[in-house]
Structures are given as C-alpha cells and as structure tokens.
Amino acid sequence: MIELHSPQYLKVTFALAFGSFLVFCNLYLFQPMLPYLANHFAVSETQINWLFAASTLALSLCLVPWAVTSEAVGRRLVMLTGLFAMPVIGLAMLYAEQFWFLVLTRALMGVALAAFASVAVAYMVEELSPQAFGKAIGGYIAANSLGGITGRIAGGLLTDALGWQHAVVAMAIFTLLGALLVAYLLPVQQHFKPQRGLFFHHNRALVKHLQNRTLWLAMLIGGVNFALFVNLYSVMGFRLVAEPYSLPIGIASLIFVCYLAGTLSSKLTANWNRRFSAIPGMMLGALISMAGMLIALIEAIPA
C-alpha cells in the first residue's frame, strides 16, 4: 500500500486531484455561456439549459456502468479513457451549427466525465493506506470545487473576450495536456484484482438500495439542495447580463467566486459532526441557503 507522504503518494494524489479538477472544469465550462448561447442559437432560456442538463444527466446515468467496467479492465484504464475522450468531444462541439448537435456532444461529454468520476475514489481505496486515503480524499474533494469555479470563470471570461468556440478550444487543449500529465504520474495499480460478470450483481445491489426509504430521503434532500444550488447560479447568470445590470458575460461569471464559500464550509463539516449531528447541520444549511435565495431577490442595495 502507498503510505502517507511517500513519493508515490504525492504522485497519486496530485494525479487524481488534477484529473478531478479537469472533469469539473469541463462539466461547468458552459454554465456562464448560457445567456450568450441562447442568443447565438435563438432558443429560450429553458431550452438552452439542456446544454448543462444533458452533460449532468449523462454523467449520473453512466457512473454505475463505468464502475462495473472498471471491475473487469482496471480503474486506471477507465479513468484515462475518459480523460482523453474529453478533448476530442470538446473539439467536436466546434462543428455544432444546430443546437441539437451541441446538446448531443454535451451529453457525450457527460459520458466521458463519468469514466473518471466513477472510479477515482475506488483507485484510492485500493492503493492507499487508510491514513493516506483519509488525507487524499480531502484534496480530491477540494479539487472538485476548484475545478467547478475555474471552469465557470474561464468559460465566462474567454467567451466574453474571444467567443464560445475559442473557450472550448482552450479547454480542450488544457484538458489534453492535463490528461497526458495524469497518465504520466498515475501508476498502474498493484492491488487491483479483475472481476467479471458483475453487471447484474451491481444492478441488483442498486435496486436493493433504492428500496431503502431512508436512502430515498437522503437522496431527495441532497438532490433538491444541489439542484437549487446549481440552477440559482444559472438564473443569476441570465439576470446579470439583462437589464438593469447589463454586465458583460466575463464580469457576470465572477459571481461563481461565491462558490468558494461552499469550499470553506465543507471543510467545517467534520468539526460540526464531531460536536453536534448531521440533521441539525442539514437544517442550518437549508436555512442559510433559503436566506441567500431571498437576498438574491433584491434588485439593488441602496448606496
């Protein structure tokens, strides 16, 4: 097993964190572009949101199939397949003359993103010692949020300065270089044992989990809160570029810096759970979120 602070540990944790960073950069790249692309393709706000929804939906649907595939062919191969597919799919978006084709390529991007997201933690569990894993998972989660912020801000600034196609090309080049770095740093697994014929086993386990009412409640709470959280940013993007603010997309995308508040609060969660419990924490989080949404209704703050 790879121990904490060893040279191998640093390589593995950086490679997986950077891979996760690339995944979330690509997932959220299009969110600040939505107002611009709605005008470009002459579609409604509801229709343009499919650019974001298609990739997220495809990602969620493909997590289990990719995880099952990795049981047979290995975690590393699945992760690298996803990473190297991402820039190829990104460049294919440049051929989108019709809106439906861009939605389709974004859905394919979600499939590629799921390849990495579904098995990175499994790789860590199998290769890292328990102490090393405990430290590594924190950096991995932090990379998720930093990737989301970077993708959103880069998408807005590059679209504002150069156009959406150049933003996509820049992200594709960055992702390709990053994928090469991850492939170089991430070692072949030493503790992986291939297992085949697990597709139906995992499906039965998934159905069993879905029959658990407590899990349904937990998933409902998490799903609703995440949907409100993500879509509020989309709504604010449309609001900030419209009257009376009329901000450029690049400036409007800076609202995603607020995402860092979640990065900070997630670090405090462990301390909260040690002193209190999860349920009061969820209630407090919901109240703070509700307060934020009510504040967002205010048109302007008087000087």
Question: Over which residues does each language-model region extend?
Answer:
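Juxtamembrane intracellular "pre-TM" segments in multi-pass secondary transporters
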Residues: I2-H5, P187-A218
